[in-house]
Amino acid sequence: MTTQDKDLTAQTASRVLSGIQPTADSYHLGNYLGAVKQWIDLQDSYDAFYFIPDLHAITVDQEPEELRNRTISGAAQLLALGIDPERSTLFVQSHVPAHAELSWVLTCLTGFGEASRMTQFKDKSSKRGADRTSAGLFTYPMLMAADILLYRPHLVPVGEDQRQHLELTRTLAERFNNRFGKAFEVPEGFIPQGASKIYDLQNPTAKMSKSGDNPKGIINLLDDPKVSTKRIKSAVTDNDGVIAYDPENKPGVSNLLVIQSALTGTSIDSLVDGYQGAGYGALKGDTADALEAFTTPLKAKYDEYMNDRGELERVLAIGAERATEVANETLADVYDKIGFLASRR
């Protein structure tokens, strides 16, 4: 390992990066408990970079004004949930041009067959059909690789559905480093401690998702409490009436226990013990109460941020400035190593 390589590793060993798309009016409970809650904890021990991937959002059709509104709303939600701009860097992807620039370099390093094997593209394109599938969806993994590699993070919180993309990112980093010299850290993916996988309320064997078949299966963080309570109380369970944690045989009941445990900090075992002899109505009612206790102050904080758009834009501008500084340093190194003529402007 060269001195330059050692310096690069030392600078980035404590850096973490992740993002969440602005493709809905509200983030849902699965977004928070499965990802953002852990991001908040990571701020204390890592140099954290969190971003809103609006470039990724346009791989499918978006209404311009809706995308703009969802992007600023997404930032307000992240801040209200606990992302602290004093402890992390929060920015919008399109505010840092280096993402698109590095994406092209990485696309040129990716084999067509390699990109064609990405299962998310195959799944989504088969559902949409060739005529409604953009080339941007095909190159999505290379943009994701650029998002990550620009900041030279050591760790990337990642869900199971993104593991293949992270493996491609690692492959591209190693390929570039071996061919041109080390410019990138090869990041490790990890699922943070305490991450909770939340399932659809109407189909508790499927992950809660904004693209789910039934909107009643999703708990949106900004929904009116009455709407969320109704969805919790109509959640699919089973017919035996026994409250037990058994994801395989009682997925609906287990999902409600996980939600309540994650929101209250009470262990699942303690919850199950407390419900001995009780029915599903008690479990659903308590889960709905825990959700309302969480979302009520959240929405108040969210409204404060949304009512001061100037402050929101200031926070994002500061984040973009820092992100650009880090990203441009990486991009300049890449451009030099790959043989681009340096610009003197």
UniProtKB/Swiss-Prot annotation:
Gene3D superfamilies to which the protein is assigned, alphabetical: HUPs, Tyrosyl-Transfer RNA Synthetase
S-S pairs: none
Keywords from the named record: Aminoacyl-tRNA synthetase, ATP-binding, Cytoplasm, Ligase, Nucleotide-binding, Protein biosynthesis
Cell compartment(s), UniProt: Cytoplasm
Recorded GO MF terms: ATP binding; tryptophan-tRNA ligase activity
EC number: 6.1.1.2
Motif 'KMSKS' region in this chain: 207-211
InterPro entries, per the entry: aa-tRNA-synth_Ic, Rossmann-like_a/b/a_fold, Trp-tRNA-ligase, Trp-tRNA-ligase_bac-type, Trp-tRNA_synthetase
Known catalytic reactions: tRNA(Trp) + L-tryptophan + ATP = L-tryptophyl-tRNA(Trp) + AMP + diphosphate + H(+)
Residues the record lists as binding ATP: Q21, P22, T23, G30, N31, G159, E160, D161, I198, K207, M208, S209, K210, S211
Binding annotation for L-tryptophan: D147
Principal localisation: cytoplasm
GO BP terms: tryptophanyl-tRNA aminoacylation
Gene Ontology terms: cellular component: cytosol
Chain ranges for the short sequence motif 'HIGH' region as given in the UniProt record: 22-31
Family: Belongs to the class-I aminoacyl-tRNA synthetase family.
UniProt function note: Catalyzes the attachment of tryptophan to tRNA(Trp).
Quaternary structure annotation from Swiss-Prot or TrEMBL: Homodimer.
Protein name according to UniProt: Tryptophan--tRNA ligase
The species this protein was found in: Corynebacterium glutamicum (strain ATCC 13032 / DSM 20300 / JCM 1318 / BCRC 11384 / CCUG 27702 / LMG 3730 / NBRC 12168 / NCIMB 10025 / NRRL B-2784 / 534)
High-level lineage: Bacteria, Bacillati, Actinomycetota, Actinomycetes, Mycobacteriales
Name of the coding gene: trpS
